[in-house]
């Protein structure tokens, strides 16, 4: 199955900036973008508008914003970790939040990593490049996670 990054981001400007940063850094992996927490869960669990898509890929990594409409990032994370199908899925919180409590909650509920979105364009490009290369090119999933996917 092909490698996919799931970007869960409601801000259109941040979506485009992330996609542009990946392209600019030659991370050619397909990126599926969803706009809120409910749509993220629908994609990952094959429900809602994704219910009849047998070719829906399992992402190599989820880049998850925290402040999302309908269902926040922490609630998405809690549901992913509670389900055997997604408990091993790498979830990187990728957010502009600088709140200590968000970092604590992210790790408490099973985030693989917490990355603050840099404000400066060049730093943002570098952060996205590093995330894309690490999770697609370097990271090895546990064998059972590959079987569960």
Describe each PLM feature range.
Residues 2-13, 18-23, 62:
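Conserved acidic segment of CheY-like receiver
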Residues 16-20, 75, 98-113, 119, ...:
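Alpha4 helix (beta4-alpha4-beta5 surface) of REC/receiver domains from two-component response regulators
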Residues 28-35, 41-44:
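Short hydrophobic/Thr-rich beta-strand motif most characteristic of the beta2 strand and flanking loop
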Residues 33, 68-71:
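Residue-level signal for the "D+5" position in two-component response regulator receiver
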Residues 36-39, 57-60, 72-75:
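Acidic catalytic/metal-coordinating carboxylates
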Residues 39, 119-132, 140-145:
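C-terminal output helix
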Residues 49-52, 74-87:
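Short amphipathic alpha-helix used as the core "switch/output" element in two-component signaling
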Residues 65-66, 95:
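Active-site residues of response regulator receiver
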């Amino acid at each position: 199955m092909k490698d996919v990054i799931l970007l869960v981001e409601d801000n259109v400007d941040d979506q485009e900036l992330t996609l542009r940063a990946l392209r600019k850094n030659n991370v050619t992996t397909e990126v599926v973008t969803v706009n809120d927490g409910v749509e993220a869960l629908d994609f990952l669990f094959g429900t809602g508008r994704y219910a009849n898509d047998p070719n829906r890929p399992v992402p190599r990594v989820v880049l998850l914003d925290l402040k999302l409409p309908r269902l926040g990032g922490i609630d998405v994370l809690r549901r992913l970790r509670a389900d055997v199908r997604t408990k091993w899925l790498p979830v990187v919180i990728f957010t502009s939040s600088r709140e200590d409590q968000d970092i604590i909650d992210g790790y408490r509920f099973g985030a693989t990593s917490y990355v603050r979105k840099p404000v400066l364009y060049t730093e943002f490009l570098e952060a996205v490049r590093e995330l894309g290369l690490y999770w697609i090119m370097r990271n090895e999933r546990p064998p059972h996670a590959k079987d569960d996917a």
